[in-house]
Amino acid sequence: MPRVKGGTVTRKRRKKVLKLAKGYYGSKHTLYKVANQAVMKSGQYAYRDRRQKKRDFRKLWITRINAAARMNGLSYSRLMHGLKVAGIEVNRKMLADLAVTDAAAFTQLADAAKKAVAK
């Protein structure tokens, strides 16, 4: 029987990859070589999309704020400028949440922005 050098390390590495590939379709969860490629690619997708998610949510918040602002007779850019001039520091996430859940509070902020821009 030939001597095996690093056999336990190799087995551990392969088991780790196959564990990460659990739930993949077809041979991607059983064959090491294919599973390794799939796991590497999924890691690339995960890395890319963690950054993409931040952009997607910001786009969603801006869309919601713009829709609510236009219902109050303002564009998104004028609303944001008015809030900045008025000294109201509310981030886009909170503004979007107010626009969806509490329209009255958002209207008050929009009115404050209108007054600040009018000055």
Swiss-Prot record:
CDD domains: Ribosomal_L20 (cd07026)
Gene Ontology MF, one: rRNA binding
GO cellular component terms given for this protein: ribonucleoprotein complex; ribosome
Keywords, comma-separated and alphabetical: Ribonucleoprotein, Ribosomal protein, RNA-binding, rRNA-binding
PROSITE patterns xrefs: RIBOSOMAL_L20 (PS00937)
GO biological process: ribosomal large subunit assembly; translation
Entries under SUPFAM superfamilies matching the protein: Ribosomal protein L20
Role played: Binds directly to 23S ribosomal RNA and is necessary for the in vitro assembly process of the 50S ribosomal subunit. It is not involved in the protein synthesizing functions of that subunit.
Family: Belongs to the bacterial ribosomal protein bL20 family.
NCBIfam families found in the cross-reference section: rplT_bact
Protein name as catalogued: Large ribosomal subunit protein bL20
Organism per entry: Lysinibacillus sphaericus (strain C3-41)
